[in-house]
Amino acid sequence: MLRSSFKTLSAKAAAQLDQELMSTGAFSIDQLMELAGLSVAQAIYKQYPPKKSCNNTVLVLVGPGNNGGDGLVAARHLKLWGGYDPILYYPKRTKNQLYSNLVTQLHDLDVNELESVEDVKRLVSVPQAGVDLIIDSLFGFSFKPPIRAPFDELIRYLAENHDKIAPIVSVDIPSGWDVDKGPTDLDINATMLVSLTAPKPCAARFVDSSAEKIHYLGGRFINPKIAKKYDIEELVDLYEGNELIVKFV
């Protein structure tokens, strides 16, 4: 499959598909988030396997919505598998019990948190701190610009320093991007993208921007009827055996 010749779902279609999964499909948001986050963790494990000498330090940037929840789930799986030390930055929290539970699960695994964007800057800018990877789970396909506080300063810092910091793995779309058109004024220049359910239109811009970009597909929970309705059967068919992720070549 060519790098950018894959089926995509618009933000509107992706939202409709999610609603269908949770209505007639009888999935709960907990299930979908767990499977999505597991896919992200597996893609990271495959692309950035644990070191033999020491753990990989993974900075997880968590947003206020479902995309952030996917990041929290991914952090838990990476911690449980061993070889990874996730650190959270979760500046804008929701009172939703689902997210509170995910954070509690991470606290029970002794996962640490950063308190401010200044803490993030200090951590990623010091080579000896050893941040090996950054998970961008700030904004998903429902994001609408402009970027507001407290995320504007963080996105700007990532965009201006992407060549000096650890590789960034974005969940579903690179944060700050327009889901259909791609990068806006600020581009965090993620190294890897994990598209969930189906790539969004901006994914084509992502892979075409550089031959070094890495693109995975995850979120294997689409039944054949829904796949046919949304014309993404060829994506579902890419999964092999019991694999939960696909790497686009």
Write out the residue ranges for each language-model feature.
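YjeF_N-associated NAD(P)HX repair module
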Residues: 2-9, 21, 130-249
